[in-house]
Amino acid sequence: MSEALNIPEEELRIGVYVCHCGSNIAGVIPPKEVAEFAATLPGVVHATDTLYACADSGQSLIKEDIKKYKLNRVVVSACSVRMHEPTFRGAVAEAGLNPFLMEMANIREQCTWAHCHDPEGALKKAKDLTAAAVAKVSFLQPLDMIRVPVSKRALVIGGGV
């Protein structure tokens, strides 16, 4: 039998940051409209758009807002998770928030690049991905990185010819 969902007991205070990524995102969809949509989602207390979220100024904005709005979750709707997730986890951690209480929505590659000839569809998808990230971050719990000792011994059975 599965355990019940562990929903945070503290009030959710989610901040959403929608990046323009220069014209990579803003050239196809209006990030401000995505931010305005995000502001209507449950638990979101602050939503804004920013020119380059990954730049020092964008990271500073996130760090300041975590303190200013007492945010306990952050969503960044921007570009590649693979490239920028460590950047935003670091910024969130520097602001005193557990870095695992941050989620990203890749609206550049998955929306504006993939649907550049369908701005209306790209905008709808960007809103959907942002809403999904907000829903996911609502259920995230703080995690800690741990180190596990590695044994330098191994036994290989059936290693082949």
Which residues are covered by each model-predicted region?
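Residues forming the flavin
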Residues: 1-161
